[in-house]
């Protein structure tokens, strides 16, 4: 069975054959589950400031749950 990918921006797992794989010039591979995640990454948006990302939820737990 194929391995599920995890979005490099929002942290959501998604099925193989969906999403997009982006390879940077330095060889780092980024996976995006949606066009929304891809756009936000290239616009430089911080995933820790967006409530729908896993990074936000993890940062919130570290701060004490506010």
Swiss-Prot record:
Note describing how the cofactor binds? Binds 1 zinc ion per subunit.
Where is Zn(2+) bound in this sequence? 7, 10, 33, 37
**Its GO CC terms?**
ribonucleoprotein complex; ribosome
Gene3D superfamilies reported in the protein's UniProt record:
Ribosomal protein L24e
Which CDD domains does the annotation name? Ribosomal_L24e_L24
Keywords recorded for this protein, A-Z: Metal-binding, Ribonucleoprotein, Ribosomal protein, RNA-binding, rRNA-binding, Zinc, Zinc-finger
Zn-finger (C4-type) residues: 7-37
GO MF terms, alphabetically ordered: rRNA binding; structural constituent of ribosome; zinc ion binding
- A single Pfam family it belongs to is Ribosomal_L24e
Needs which cofactor?
Zn(2+)
Q: Tell me which Gene Ontology terms the entry assigns under biological process.
A: translation
HAMAP family membership: Ribosomal_eL24
Q: How does it assemble?
A: Part of the 50S ribosomal subunit. Forms a cluster with proteins L3 and L14.
Family listed:
Belongs to the eukaryotic ribosomal protein eL24 family.
Q: What does this protein do?
A: Binds to the 23S rRNA.
Q: What is the protein's name according to its record?
A: Large ribosomal subunit protein eL24
Q: Which organism's genome codes for this protein?
A: Pyrococcus furiosus (strain ATCC 43587 / DSM 3638 / JCM 8422 / Vc1)
The top of its lineage is:
Archaea, Methanobacteriati, Methanobacteriota, Thermococci, Thermococcales
Query: What's the name of its gene?
Result: rpl24e
């Amino acid at each position: 069975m194929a391995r599920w990918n995890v979005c490099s921006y929002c942290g959501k797992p998604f099925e193989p054959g969906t999403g997009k794989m982006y390879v940077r010039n330095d060889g780092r591979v980024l996976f995006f589950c949606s066009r929304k995640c891809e756009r936000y990454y290239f616009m430089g948006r911080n995933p820790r400031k967006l409530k729908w990302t896993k990074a936000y939820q993890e940062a919130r737990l570290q701060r004490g749950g506010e």
